[in-house]
Amino acid sequence: MVEYLVSLGADVRSNYDHAIKSAFENGHLQVIKYLISLGSDVSMHYDYILLRASRNGYIDVVKYLIEQGVDPRTNNDKAVRKASKNGRLEIVEYLVTLGADIRIDNDSAVRWASKNGHIKTVEFLVAKGADIRAKNDYSLRHSSKHGHIKMVEYLVAQGADVRADNDYAIKWASGKGHLEVVKYLVEKGADFRADNDCAVKWASQTGRVEIVEYLVSKGAVCPY
């Protein structure tokens, strides 16, 4: 299609090289190479494009950009952090081979991956030295908040503290309606009555009937 449009006289560089930018955004490497052969040039935007390609999982584009001289560690290793956040394990692994620092920004790579439930990515990062307890057990607290039970179980097995930050995990899991997570946290010693029965209050306020019933059965006092 692109070749056809070019044959009709389309200007591949119109609108500030929008065509090639779009090709990068969508991971169309062959189109990218074709447009470059016709004179398209977005080299001044390569760093930004690397971040987008890493986030979106376009490993071929990431490799191509690095072959063109883009620094894989640009912007404080933002590429590996973006890839981790979105569970792009293949890209994370590749960037690590190029020297990416997975622990930069207070272990934001493993924190974001945990929050979003990307367990394979988290396992890889931990194997490479990431601290799952960084920032007051952010990984466990936010994976609990978002209901990622397998992630929660994994993090606890790795030594995460279910009671961190005044039992943040069970309070947020309760308020968000994640019953399986709530039960698991209670089993592992979370204080479901912390902060003046905050967990059952939040569950009640957000209409999480099953969680309210469960917590009350355990001894929580619901004031409503």
Swiss-Prot record:
SUPFAM superfamilies: Ankyrin repeat. The keyword Repressor does not apply. SMART domains: ANK (SM00248). The keyword Repeat applies. ANK repeats lie at residues 1-14, 15-44, 46-74, 75-104, 105-134, 136-164, 165-194, 196-224. Pfam families: Ank_2 (PF12796). It comes from the Viruses. Keywords: ANK repeat, Repeat. This is Putative ankyrin repeat protein R845. It comes from Acanthamoeba polyphaga mimivirus.
